[in-house]
């Protein structure tokens, strides 16, 4: 915690932050205001709530310190040449009432459906053979809360806050990571991020390779100016069995994740469609890939990058219990 000392204006919030971090990193089965207070020896959650809601400290500065602290040991532990991936994902937190900034009825993975809560976009740093860690986060705020001055005031939102999609929030997270010197071989994410043209353009402007999930209806430009959806492209170009190869995309909760994979070149020399097929059901998943000139573009490399996104999906919910707060 000594590295975080400069981000706090007073010693009291710094000491409370140290207690809070120890509780979050503990083996508490459920982490919320009351359980954290009991674990650190506080009589009530007031001190922690004051730290998170009202105390004066540099949030972005703290994120920068933590990001550098988290990335360095993973790089040191990784095998030479192993992939580094920035994995984008969002996670919900259930909330009661309407007083919390960003709260609305929406799809919540932690609730298994539609429920009242907030959504936060996360960026994780994944280093093959070494591990993964969260390095950035931004809360998504619904447009209707930003456009209503009364709601913005009552929930504590800045009156000059501009609406941002989850893809646009991801751009901010990645920009911060790039400024901090975080090097990524690929950026990976699900359909939320693959559908964001601004995010894809940002990554390409920075010569940053990506493997982003897209819907079956995503339109591709193939050779000779042919326009096909992902489904149509697979039906036309991947009929033959020899077009598919069986590869592992890494370990999962039930062992190795092995699928059939294929890829299709587009009219652009730096864009590809990567297709994953379930070996039993035949279900297809599509990834739009960008690999800048001068970087290796191979099927095994793209498959590995796509697979490195999966371990992150449960990180913030399971390990840090971020879906437990009410």
Report residues per predicted region.
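An anionic, glycine-rich sequence signature occurring as long contiguous blocks
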Residues: 128-151, 155, 159, 211-314
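Trp- and S/T/G-rich repeat-edge/linker motifs of beta-rich repeat architectures
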Residues: 317-318
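Conserved, well-structured functional cores that handle cations and Mg-NTP chemistry
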Residues: 1-188, 192-209, 216-219
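Basic, amphipathic alpha-helical segments enriched in Lys/Arg and hydrophobic/aromatic residues
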Residues: 323-326
């Amino acid at each position: 915690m000594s590295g975080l000392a400069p981000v706090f204006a007073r010693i009291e919030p710094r000491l409370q932050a140290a207690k809070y971090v120890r509780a979050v990193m503990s083996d508490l089965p459920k982490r919320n205001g009351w359980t954290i207070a009991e674990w650190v020896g506080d009589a009530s959650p007031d001190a922690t709530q004051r730290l998170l809601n009202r105390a004066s400290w540099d949030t972005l500065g703290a994120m920068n310190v933590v990001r550098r602290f988290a990335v360095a040991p993973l790089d040191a532990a990784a095998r030479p040449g192993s992939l580094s991936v920035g994995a984008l994902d969002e996670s919900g937190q259930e909330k009661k009432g309407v007083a919390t900034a960003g709260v609305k009825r929406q799809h919540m993975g932690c609730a298994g459906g539609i429920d009242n809560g907030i959504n936060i976009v996360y960026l994780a740093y994944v280093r093959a053979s070494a591990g993964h860690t969260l390095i950035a986060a931004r809360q998504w705020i619904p447009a209707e809360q930003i456009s209503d001055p009364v709601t913005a005031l009552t929930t504590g939102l800045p009156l000059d806050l501009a609406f941002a999609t989850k893809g646009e929030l991801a751009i901010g997270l990645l920009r911060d990571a790039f400024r901090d010197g975080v090097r990524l071989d690929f950026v990976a994410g699900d359909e939320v991020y693959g559908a964001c043209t601004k995010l894809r353009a940002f990554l390409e402007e920075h010569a940053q390779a990506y493997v982003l999930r897209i819907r079956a209806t995503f339109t591709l430009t193939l050779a000779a100016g042919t326009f096909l959806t992902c489904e149509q492209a697979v039906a036309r170009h991947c009929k033959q069995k020899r077009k598919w190869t069986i590869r592992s995309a890494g370990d999962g909760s039930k062992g190795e994740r092995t699928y059939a994979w294929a890829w299709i070149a587009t009219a652009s020399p730096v864009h590809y469609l990567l297709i994953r097929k379930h070996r039993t059901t035949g279900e297809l998943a599509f990834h739009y890939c960008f690999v800048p000139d001068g970087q290796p573009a191979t099927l095994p490399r793209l498959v590995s990058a796509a697979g490195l996104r999966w371990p992150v999906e449960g990180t913030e919910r399971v390990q840090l219990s971020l879906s437990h707060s009410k």
